[in-house]
């Protein structure tokens, strides 16, 4: 019985197969012998073998990192001029502590006779200033790197700053109006001053936080926040409804109890 098998490949395809079978990679050279009987053996030059046997990294150096020119310049300046680098850190720390000290002095000086003023001034001088000095002086490189990354990130998001500046004053005006209503309702001058001080402090901190959040992610403090709260409430309602309408397994299979 004759075999009537006819190949579907064209002569050009067969010629290409012959070329690729006997083709030698000039960069890799001849392929070494491959023993398929060995367990875990993979063909040479295989992508799977490269993934299974990665090139070991030098434990002393670790993975290669991309060199940052700013870090290199800072380290070079630190190594070449250690005294100047030390004085620079000391000067920045003293300036920051001086600004905090004089700000506390100006704000607390009218209340120096009261107990609140004495406590606030002593806490500022005894706790805040030393902590600030230690943080700036000993962690100089850490916070400078963090500030540099933050400035670069804000420069990338500069288009969002206009809407952020619009939202922050609106929030401050609403808060200030509420503070005036509360002060006039209480009527006491002392409570009115406390409400004003707390409102302005909260307004300053909230404005900074809103500016940062809105610059990084537009709408995170307004529209997106409302949507997230609404989605969370819907999810809780669905969970509550499903828990009330769920049928226990015993009622579904009464035969199992018997």
Swiss-Prot record:
Region span, Disordered: 1-71
Compartments, as annotated in UniProt: Spore membrane; Vacuole membrane
Biased composition (Basic and acidic residues): 19-30
GO CC terms: cytoplasm; vacuolar membrane
Membrane topology label: Multi-pass membrane protein
One GO biological process term: meiotic drive
Keywords assigned by UniProt, alphabetized: Membrane, Transmembrane, Transmembrane helix, Vacuole
Main localization (coarse): membrane
Residue stretches spanning the membrane: 84-106, 121-140, 196-216
Function comment: Acts as a suppressor component of the dual wtf meiotic drive system, and can suppress but not confer meiotic drive by compatible poisons. Wtf meiotic drive systems promote unequal transmission of alleles from the parental zygote to progeny spores by encoding a poison and an antidote from the same locus; the poison is trans-acting and forms toxic aggregates in all spores within an ascus, wherease the antidote is spore-specific and targets aggregates for degradation by the vacuole.
The family this protein is said to belong to: Belongs to the WTF family.
Subunit: Homomer. Interacts with other proteins that exhibit high sequence similarity.
Protein name: Meiotic drive suppressor wtf20
Organism: Schizosaccharomyces pombe (strain 972 / ATCC 24843)
